[in-house]
Amino acid sequence: GDCLLIRCTFPKDKPVEFLFPVRLAYEPIKTATHLSNHGIYLKKHEVVTVMDYMIKWGTVMSNEIEADIIRNQMGWTDDNRTSFVIGDREYKRDGTVAQTPFSAITDKIGKHMIPKGTFEDWKKAANQLDTPGMELHQYAMLTGFASPLMAYTNTDGAIVCLTGETGAAKTGALFSAVSIWGNPKVLYVHAKKGGTFNALKGRISTLHNMTYAHDEVTNLDAEDVSELSHMISTGKPKLKMQASINAERDFESSASMIALFTSNKSIYDKLSALKHDPNGEVARIIEFMLGQPKILQTDLNFGKRVFEKIGRAHV
């Protein structure tokens, strides 16, 4: 339903922005609860006044301006690829750029895709990969640019896995691809046992066409690696039933991207240990073995350091 984008300033604290569903303006308790969740505390008699205020503003704006569309995914907005969402901006085919409010789904990652730094700074960082022995690191960076182009192909998704021992700058290569779209230190996923697999699926769905970067998939269970490979290559998760009733769960949004993994050990070997014939999964993954380039023998953090504080290439 329709929402109002609320910006509230406080005497001491930082301003906050959030979406207020207009339907809540007809229910005092839900209005008060929603506002209190964002640090706005009202007395009982003030709640009705605020409700009236929200309804009036909603009416005025619906009569005077066209509503912005809240997107639940980054990347292409439709099958015709008429516009592309990055953070809170929607870049349209006609050259215009529209603001798009974050939804509850995109808020956690969208705010880390706000343009910062300069393209010149990013190019300087990227050009440091133009070093003998770092050709595969360059390739990994270019998967970040190639990921949105998967929507133009007959293949929904692909996985590139960088495998090698510690010190091969695998994470630096990962950062280089993610830095195209936003802050790599926040947007990449580091695998640890006990993580929520549903959260990983949600991240893939939200990124939609941007590179999904997963560091150290060695720490994932083989079953999870198998399911991730299926989901990324087909563009959607497996069908599952609802827990309480005999019915399929609601449709989950699809994705079309290139995912970038890193691993200390061969991901092919990991899948082979899971089943006798892992060819279905192996066919979905391209694995490259990385050695340690000479430059990293004296500077182990070269790749990661270069990309962790730079601008965004998409601007």
List PLM regions with ranges.
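Conserved glycine-centered beta->alpha loop in an early N-terminal alpha/beta scaffold
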Residues: G1-P132, G202, L207, S272
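AAA+/P-loop NTPase substrate/partner-engagement loops
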Residues: C161, A173-V225
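Conserved AAA+/SF3 P-loop NTPase catalytic/coupling segment centered on the Walker-B
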Residues: A213-I232, A255, D269-D277
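A short helix-turn-beta junction within AAA+ P-loop NTPase domains corresponding to the substrate/partner-engaging
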Residues: D269-I295, V306-F307
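Conserved small/polar residues in nucleotide/adenosyl-binding loops
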Residues: A313-V315
